[in-house]
Amino acid sequence: MSWQAYVDDHLMCDIEGHEGHRLTAAAIVGHDGSVWAQSATFPQFKPEEMNGIMTDFNEPGHLAPTGLHLGGTKYMVIQGEAGAVIRGKKGSGGITIKKTGQAVVCGIYEEPVTPGQCNMVVERLGDYLIEQGL
């Protein structure tokens, strides 16, 4: 399966039990900041934004004072899982980022999608990739 198929079929799909509800944007990005695959709607990000995200995985709390920035959008960092998941909130939407062995899986959402639904979609794929050694 191509990386693009993972984004299209596992991240940008309808959320279970909620036909028509899906993430706004999603991507799989290597730890080095290279985009493996992304939805057409995923924001163009700056290298320093991805560097900040990777630093927060290695030093949990790094982004808390400044917020998480991606594609010029600032998200308030909320409870995640140290070294594994970063979650951010902006208005009625937000972002979930799950770290795997070689990449990060990113999902961005807006209402009516809930934070929990975004977490489920992103973390499920991230856990699968970890199981596959990726």
UniProtKB/Swiss-Prot annotation:
Post-translational modification: Phosphorylated by MAP kinases.
Record-linked PROSITE patterns: PROFILIN (PS00414)
Disulfide bonds: 13-118
Record GO terms (molecular function): actin monomer binding
InterPro entries: PFN, PFN_euk, PFN_sf, Profilin_CS
Entries under Pfam families matching the protein: Profilin
Domain of life the protein comes from: Eukaryota
Key words of the record: Actin-binding, Allergen, Cytoplasm, Cytoskeleton, Disulfide bond, Phosphoprotein
Keyword Phosphoprotein appears in the UniProt entry: yes
Function: Binds to actin and affects the structure of the cytoskeleton. At high concentrations, profilin prevents the polymerization of actin, whereas it enhances it at low concentrations.
Membership in a protein family: Belongs to the profilin family.
Further comment found in the protein's record: The variability of the residues taking part of IgE-binding epitopes might be responsible of the difference in cross-reactivity among olive pollen cultivars, and between distantly related pollen species, leading to a variable range of allergy reactions among atopic patients.
Assembly: Occurs in many kinds of cells as a complex with monomeric actin in a 1:1 ratio.
Protein name: Profilin-2
Record lineage: Eukaryota, Viridiplantae, Streptophyta, Embryophyta, Tracheophyta
